């Protein structure tokens, strides 16, 4: 009986995946996939135009967040909750 209970406890712990955190793409010097800090379980992609928008295209920011950011005028924001669900648009073409 003790072995059965111990087995159930071990299986339960393995199935819970304790301490899981989301992985998101983040922008910086280069685009990388990183584990998000605890409490930041969403990935986001924010785009907007700056003064170079006509020649370079929209600015793209990727990262982790606890809540989806509020959209400001002339910004577009998308949020998602699975690992690396916020790839840079050019990465999707590969």
Curated annotation (Swiss-Prot):
UniProt entry tagged with the keyword Cytoplasm: no
One Gene Ontology cellular component: extracellular region
UniProt family annotation: Belongs to the three-finger toxin family. Long-chain subfamily. Type II alpha-neurotoxin sub-subfamily.
Protein's name in the database: Long neurotoxin LNTX1
Gene3D superfamilies recorded: CD59
Quaternary structure annotation from Swiss-Prot or TrEMBL: Monomer.
Tissue and organ expression note: Expressed by the venom gland.
PROSITE patterns per UniProt: SNAKE_TOXIN
Species assigned in the record: Ophiophagus hannah
Subcellular location(s) of the protein: Secreted
Role summary: Binds with high affinity to muscular (alpha-1/CHRNA1) and neuronal (alpha-7/CHRNA7) nicotinic acetylcholine receptor (nAChR) and inhibits acetylcholine from binding to the receptor, thereby impairing neuromuscular and neuronal transmission. Recombinant LNTX1 leads to a functional block of the muscle-type acetylcholine receptors. Has a cytotoxic activity.
